[in-house]
Regions:
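Membrane-embedded alpha-helical bundles of multi-pass integral membrane proteins
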Residues: 1-266, 282, 345
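Short coil/turn segments at secondary-structure boundaries
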Residues: 69-75, 288, 316, 353-354
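Short, function-defining helix-loop hinge/capping sites that tune catalysis or transport
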Residues: 86, 188, 233, 248, ...
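Iron-sulfur cluster-binding electron-transfer modules in prokaryotic oxidoreductases
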Residues: 205-212, 261-263, 269, 326-327, ...
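Iron-sulfur cluster-binding cysteine motifs and their immediate structural context
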Residues: 243-246, 276, 280-306, 312-345, ...
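Short, charged low-complexity linear segments at domain edges
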Residues: 244-267, 290-308, 385, 503-512, ...
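Sequence context surrounding c-type heme c attachment/ligation sites in exported
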Residues: 269-276
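Aromatic-flanked redox-active Cys/Sec active sites in thiol-based oxidoreductases
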Residues: 272, 315, 403
Length: 593
């Protein structure tokens, strides 16, 4: 049996180009990894992490479980295309073995097996199974066509605006499986066989189309099928569909603890090109839903970075609230990629940023517990006064790092991309904390909390947000609170909730003093207040617009007081509502017996 026909040529060329480009990209990216990352891969290979990564590939790259959580119909669409095509390949491979044994069959022989196997006795099991899988994939294609017409049916208000290369690949992919159906059915019409789908369509064709036109149709259909595959394969490495072959190594590398950092690295390529541009990140973005800004979302940031088209406006206009990352089905570390892109654009060390604090120490008090207010808390003095009262009520001796002013934690500069200047600030504060011998560091600012935990080297110092610290005091019996009838609603700050995973502690504190009413968007889905220090592009008026939309949802709970656990959120939400907005520490002080 000869496994070649002229129509195979587009497929063969396309597959050769695709695999050559994939090998070049993977090889280059892996080669350029730093030695430490290569060691992580080497030591991670013979561990359980490899098995965990393999399972994640099945559950996410094929079954798309994260997308199912967004919308079941959307999840089914992605699964039918990915898992269905995979099964067509796997079962098709088994089919050739069932017919021919383990003899060598070239790649095109497997792909176009129905064309080459016309003289063989048909096996009903494979005819039925392959038709069932083809129908499975075709159902996904139909849903993809429908999504283009009405995306809301799949829970998406907005879809991605694709570049021309993506449209070429998308068009080719959409026609691959309908073309396969017609080609295989035409062959069945001429030579018999086929399952419930191709066989039935083939019978219809043979009854309505003459032999010569049918032979011409068969040839044209196989050419079209092969050409669609060839075009798709050539376009794939340069389009959004590169994610098919990039998400898999990304999952393994992530399991081996490779991460994106403050500076761009070769590992970033795996993250950037693993983006499928599915558009799931668009709807959660408040810049889009509130302000109508629709060209800076993560999908466009990653696209522009990949093609070296990234503009300052796109890189800087992001709240970095994490709402999009929470929904990303590939789990790309979007904020880290933003930071190192900004670092590349903005990081020019400036002595004026940090020169002023050489030798500066305005701290006061003594004690093993230290309190770092942070810049934003200093702008909301009631929060710091409340913490002072709580420390006094608990009998805590406290060292105050910055009650009379001090040095910023450094995170705002880091988020702006000025990482070298930020590191100077971090070193100063870390030295100050160690100098005064504290063992616990409490802060009321989630921005400070996150940078202390992730970027500071503070061995032997426990770092707590004031919500965690207050709850500890309550449970230890060091604070006696009176539970009242006041109704509160709680706003989850981005850096505290999605950023640091602290959701339960603030709620437990609120429930110790009154009734908690949850807003519509809460916990992982909580809205950003709009005044993020990470966004240097939107105006003050636009920040207020976002704050009003957040406050409206909080007011809708019917609560008497809006509570938050971030000084920046407190100020922002306060500008968007006439309701009373308090910090968590303030309602605790009011309830102390």
């Amino acid at each position: 049996m000869t496994f070649y026909a002229p129509f195979c040529l587009p497929f063969i060329i396309g597959a050769a180009v695709m695999f050559a480009v994939l090998a070049w990209k993977w090889g280059t990216w892996l080669y350029r990894l730093p030695r430490a990352d290569k060691k992580r891969i080497l030591f991670g290979l013979p561990t359980r992490r490899t098995f965990g990564a393999a399972w994640e590939v099945v559950s996410e790259s094929l079954l798309h479980r994260r997308i199912f959580r967004v919308n079941p119909l959307l999840g089914y669409m992605h699964m039918s295309l990915a898992f269905g095509w995979f099964l067509l390949i796997a079962v098709g491979w088994a089919e050739t073995i069932a017919y021919l044994g383990f003899r060598y069959v070239p790649l095109q022989g497997h792909v176009f097996f129905k064309y080459f196997a016309t003289g063989l006795e048909h096996k009903p099991f494979f005819d039925f199974t392959m038709d069932l899988l083809l129908l499975f994939v075709l159902s996904g294609v139909a849903l993809a066509w429908g999504k283009r017409l009405y995306s809301r049916a799949m829970g998406m208000r907005r879809t991605t605006k694709h570049v021309p290369g993506d449209r070429v690949a998308l068009s080719a992919l959409w026609f691959v499986f309908p073309a396969r159906l017609v080609a295989e059915s035409a062959t069945c019409a001429l030579y018999g066989g086929g399952g419930f789908l191709t066989g039935s369509l083939g019978e219809w064709m043979s009854g309505h189309i003459g032999v010569m036109p049918l032979m011409n149709l068969e040839t044209a259909a196989w050419w079209f099928y092969s050409s669609c595959l060839g075009v798709f394969f050539v376009a794939l490495p340069f389009s959004r569909y590169m994610h098919i072959f990039t998400e898999i190594p990304l999952i393994f590398l992530r399991r081996y603890n490779l991460r994106s950092g403050e500076k761009e690295s070769s590992y970033d390529n795996f993250q950037v090109e693993a983006c499928s541009r599915c558009g799931i990140c668009i709807d959660p973005c408040q810049l889009q839903s509130v302000l109508g800004v629709d060209d800076v979302q993560s999908v466009y940031f990653l696209r522009d970075r990949r093609y070296n088209m990234l503009r300052l406006q796109t890189a800087d206009n992001c709240l970095m609230c994490g709402r999009c990352a929470e929904k990303c089905p590939v789990d790309i570390d979007l904020n880290s990629l933003r930071v190192n892109s900004r670092d590349k654009m903005h990081n020019v060390p400036d002595e004026r940023r940090y020169g002023y604090f050489k030798g500066l120490d305005r701290s006061e008090g003594a004690g093993k517990v230290g309190y770092f207010a942070g810049c934003m808390t200093l702008l909301t003095p009631r929060t710091m006064s409340a913490m002072s009262a709580i420390f006094e009520a608990a009998g805590e001796e406290v060292w105050w790092a910055d009650r009379e002013g001090g040095v910023c934690c450094g995170r705002p500069l880091k988020l702006a991309g000025e990482t070298d200047s930020a590191r100077k600030m971090m070193k100063y504060n870390a030295d100050l904390f160690r100098k005064h011998g504290i063992t616990t560091l409490v802060t009321s600012c989630p921005i400070c909390l996150k940078v202390f935990r992730e970027d500071y080297d503070l061995p032997g110092i426990e770092i707590l947000h004031h919500s965690e610290y207050i709850l500890r005091l309550i449970r230890a019996g060091r604070l006696s609170l009176e539970h009242g009838a006041m109704r509160f609603t709680y706003h989850d700050p981005c850096e505290l909730g999605r950023g640091s995973g602290i959701y339960d502690e603030p709620r437990a504190v609120i429930e110790a003093v009154g009734e908690l009413l949850e807003p519509a968007s809460t916990r992982e889905n909580a809205l950003c207040c709009g005044s993020s220090v990470a966004n240097t592009a939107i105006s003050d008026g636009q920040q207020v617009q976002i704050a009003r939309s957040v406050a409206a949802q909080l007011d809708a709970t019917g609560a008497e007081v809006i509570v938050t656990a971030c000084p920046l959120c407190k100020k922002a939400i306060g500008r968007g509502t006439k309701s009373e907005v308090r910090d968590l520490a303030e309602i605790v002080v009011a309830a102390i017996k």
